[in-house]
Amino acid sequence: GDTKGGILRTVFQTAYKSDAGLSAESYGRWTTNSYCLAGDDRHAIAYSMPLILPDGTVYGVVGVELLTDYLQTKLPFTELDEDKAGTYFIVTTTDDALTDDVLSLRKTVTSGEDLVTADAPLGVLNCRSDGNGGNWAELNGKRYYMVLEPLLVYNRNAPFAAEKWFLAGTMEQSVLLAFSSRVREVLLTTIAITLVLSVLGSLLVSARLA
């Protein structure tokens, strides 16, 4: 598990049980849950990898902690919507594909409003396919559109490759529809202005020719 001891134990035991048949980097793992630092109220995720001698002996683990506050600065959720209606998540899942059109995603880092799903435990998002290549989730009693971008954290043959990582961007449906409506209004206004200018231009040309 992703407890302080578990972070170190997981990669050590994985390398040890497989007789360190891969490189140390291949056994490296990021924690899928953030945790509170000892003696601190800040949260972090960690990366750890085993120390392996040339003869294959696993003798220790080395790791580094990364503050979730730092990751949040790299996920400017205001770029999704200037009114701060969007949220970025870094999420993980062990699901291979959409099962019954539902993908269970575990929140690792949140940038924006910390949305809580209504039909899954705290920290889990149930992402559903809309059948048209898009996704949505029910959050805080509202429907949110979700875009998932895979993060290539592990190579295909790594022991922890089953833990898939994604960057998820979410936007409330009503906000997204309002945004689409605004864009549509701007386009219609632009077309109307273009038509008016074209008509005026034609009239001016006709008057000059006359």
Where are these predicted regions, by residue range?
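Extracellular/periplasmic juxtamembrane segments that couple receptor/chemosensory ectodomains to their
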Residues: D41-L53, T57-G60, S111-V186
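Short, intrinsically disordered, charge-balanced linker/junction segments flanking boundaries
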Residues: G1-D2, D100, V205-A210
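Solvent-exposed, extracytoplasmic
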Residues: T57-T108
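Cytoplasm-proximal transmembrane signaling helix
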Residues: T92, F166-A210
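Extracytoplasmic/periplasmic ligand-binding sensor regions of membrane-associated signaling proteins
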Residues: G1-G63
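Short regulatory "switch" loops immediately downstream of catalytic or recognition motifs
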Residues: Q13-D19, I52, T92-D95, L148-R156
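Short helix-terminating capping/connector loops at secondary-structure junctions
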Residues: S23-E25, D83-K84, F160-A162
